[in-house]
Regions:
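Conserved alpha-helical "signature site"
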Residues: 1-145, 149-157, 166, 173-247
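Compositionally biased, intrinsically disordered low-complexity regions enriched in proline and serine
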Residues: 103, 171-174, 254, 276
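Terminal helices and disordered tails flanking the catalytic cores of nucleotide-processing hydrolases
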Residues: 1-6, 251-284
Length: 284
C-alpha cells in the first residue's frame, strides 16, 4: 500500500476509537466470551452505559419491564445491539459526517454501514463453511470508514467520476478514486484499521469488500459476506451518495455461499425490517 504523506498524516491525526469500544469489538469477535466480560467494559464508560440503558428501554425494543442494569440490558439486547450502541457513541466522529466528496448528507454513511452489517449477517447464515456472524456484523459496520477520511479530497469530483464510469473510462468508483487520488477508500480504511490496531479480519474485510476474490482462504467468506451485504444495502437504497451501485458484484461468492437470485428479495426484506427497528432504537 502506497499512501501519500498527506493521507498518512490525516490517519495519524484521526482520533482513535475509545478503548471501551475497541475492547468490545475484540471480545465479541471471540468464540468463547462471557456476558460478564462485556458488562465490566460497558460499566467503565458512563456515556456508553447511559446509551445502552436508553436503547434497551426504547419504544423500538419495548421490554416487558423496565431494564435498570447493564447486566439486564446486555442479556436482553444481545451482542449485535451492544456493538451498534458502542459504535453509535462515536458515530459523530467517524460515521455521521457529511461526505462532500460523495455528495452524501450527514448520517448517511452510518445508515449505509448499519444496513450493510445487517444484510451481511443474514447472508452469512448461508455460508458453506462456518463463519463467525459477530465478526461479519462488525466488519459490515466498519467497512467504509475510509470514506470519512478521503471525502474532502474528492470534493467536486463526483460528476466527473460518474460520467467516467458511464463512458467506460473507469470500471467502477474505486478505480476512479485511485486515478484521482492515487489510492482509494478501501486502502485508507485498511490503514485506519491498522492504526487502530484492529484484528486482521476487520482489516481485510475493509480492504477487500469491493474485491473479495483477492482475499486469502482464511478471510474469503468474511470478505464475500461484507461484499454482498454492501451490494444489498445499496440495492435497498441505503447508499452513500454518488458511488451508490457503481461497483460490480463478484460472482465468485457462489463458491462460498448457497444463494440463488431468488433469495435476494427475501434477504433485503428481512434486512430492511431489522434495519428499521435498530435505526429507531438508536434514534437515528
Amino acid at each position: 500500500m502506497s499512501l501519500s504523506k498527506e493521507i498518512l498524516k490525516k490517519i495519524k491525526e484521526t482520533s482513535p476509537l475509545s478503548q471501551c469500544v475497541l475492547q468490545i469489538l475484540r471480545i465479541t469477535s471471540k468464540e468463547d466470551y462471557s456476558l460478564s466480560e462485556i458488562v465490566k467494559i460497558v460499566e467503565c464508560d458512563s456515556v456508553l452505559t447511559a446509551n445502552v440503558l436508553r436503547v434497551s428501554n426504547s419504544a423500538a425494543i419495548s421490554p416487558a419491564r423496565p431494564i435498570i442494569s447493564i447486566n439486564m440490558a446486555i442479556s436482553y439486547l444481545g451482542e449485535k445491539m451492544i456493538v451498534n450502541t458502542a459504535l453509535s457513541t462515536c458515530a459523530n466522529q467517524f460515521f455521521n459526517k457529511k461526505l462532500e466528496g460523495y455528495e452524501s448528507p450527514k448520517g448517511e454513511l452510518w445508515l449505509h454501514c448499519l444496513m450493510t452489517a445487517i444484510a451481511a449477517k443474514i447472508v452469512s447464515k448461508n455460508s458453506k463453511t462456518p463463519i463467525n456472524s459477530n465478526i461479519v456484523y462488525t466488519a459490515g459496520i466498519l467497512h467504509d470508514i475510509g470514506k470519512s477520511v478521503i471525502s474532502s479530497m474528492l470534493s467536486g469530483t463526483s460528476e466527473k467520476i460518474v460520467s467516467g464510469i458511464l463512458e467506460h473510462k473507469y470500471s467502477n468508483y474505486l478505480e476512479a478514486e485511485r486515478d484521482i487520488l492515487g489510492f482509494d477508500h478501501c486502502e485508507v480504511g485498511e490503514a485506519l484499521a491498522i492504526h487502530w490496531k484492529l484484528p486482521d479480519y476487520y482489516r481485510y474485510a475493509i480492504k477487500l469488500h469491493h474485491a473479495p476474490s483477492g482475499a486469502e482462504a482464511e478471510f474469503a467468506p468474511l470478505c464475500f459476506a461484507v461484499h454482498l451485504g454492501d451490494i444489498l444495502s445499496m440495492m435497498n437504497g441505503a447508499g452513500t451518495g454518488s458511488d451508490c451501485l457503481q461497483y460490480e458484484i463478484c460472482k465468485e461468492y457462489e463458491n462460498y455461499f448457497d444463494i440463488s437470485g431468488n433469495d435476494i428479495p427475501n434477504f433485503i426484506m428481512i434486512a430492511d425490517n431489522e434495519y428499521n427497528i435498530v435505526k429507531e432504537a438508536l434514534n437515528f
